[in-house]
């Protein structure tokens, strides 16, 4: 897999691919970033962007991870002291998941977002962005707000200035970040900054086939125990032969196959013995043809996800 193919793997959108190709031709070591609001446990939805950062490192990028403690504070996720502690937990999780620590700069928002230069640029940007535009950007990231605070309207402006002052070439995020990233692309040039390239990953469904929500217990946290993961997978949605919006297949596609060249679905000999797959498309076809039972797929997924998360558990003990 060449450099560009690695970057494009498992992404929903690149804005724009032409600009990305130009960047790769111009810079040997470009810089990409993701900002994480430290507001709770890291789950497999977050890990999707971590996987993309690992791909980018393999493609020669230097990575910046913004641990956005000020953003979390503005978004009412706790005191600055509380979110700083969660940010440190996030950092340890990301390293345990495979980010090369030597090729990653971890930056706390509070280290640079409270300075005069930063705030002046936020104020300049606020003159160019309407209130409705800022609100629409935030509605995509979280739940729609009927009565937002001023701090929540400042949030997307800060995210755009983060991209500028961290001096990154590429902004990475889930597709829910698209409106904020487009705000940055449309306005940073007028403030004297470069226009960022944006890479967006899909939003994964919860294990029950609906949107992930802590109240539903339908997602995998990186510090879940082995027993918890097997329990969650056992009751996960996985209809026989159905490859559309199948959360178990999605875990294989986005989390397992990028880390393993070969996947073995273990089965007793009386049910045909083990199945070996060398690509996700091969596995998807096998499941569509009902060659794989949903429970065998679930058990195999749980086994591999536990292997991936085992280093995280060891770090957090």
Swiss-Prot record:
Motif range ('KMSKS' region): 211-215
GO cellular component, one term: cytoplasm
A GO term, aspect molecular function: tyrosine-tRNA ligase activity
Record flagged with keyword Coiled coil: no
InterPro entries according to UniProt: aa-tRNA-synth_I_CS, aa-tRNA-synth_Ic, Rossmann-like_a/b/a_fold, Tyr-tRNA-ligase, Tyr-tRNA-ligase_3, Tyr-tRNA-ligase_arc/euk-type, Tyr-tRNA_synthase
Catalytic activity: tRNA(Tyr) + L-tyrosine + ATP = L-tyrosyl-tRNA(Tyr) + AMP + diphosphate + H(+)
Record-level GO BP terms: tyrosyl-tRNA aminoacylation
Residue positions of motif 'HIGH' region: 38-46
Residues reported to bind L-tyrosine: 33, 155, 159, 162, 177
Keywords annotated in UniProt: Aminoacyl-tRNA synthetase, ATP-binding, Cytoplasm, Ligase, Nucleotide-binding, Protein biosynthesis
Broad class of where this protein is predominantly found: cytoplasm
Binding site for ATP: 214
Superkingdom of the organism of origin: Archaea
Class of this enzyme: ligase
UniProt-listed Enzyme Commission number(s): 6.1.1.1
Protein's cellular compartments: Cytoplasm
Similarity-based family: Belongs to the class-I aminoacyl-tRNA synthetase family. TyrS type 3 subfamily.
Purpose: Catalyzes the attachment of tyrosine to tRNA(Tyr) in a two-step reaction: tyrosine is first activated by ATP to form Tyr-AMP and then transferred to the acceptor end of tRNA(Tyr).
Subunit structure: Homodimer.
Protein name: Tyrosine--tRNA ligase
Source organism: Methanosarcina mazei (strain ATCC BAA-159 / DSM 3647 / Goe1 / Go1 / JCM 11833 / OCM 88) (Methanosarcina frisia)
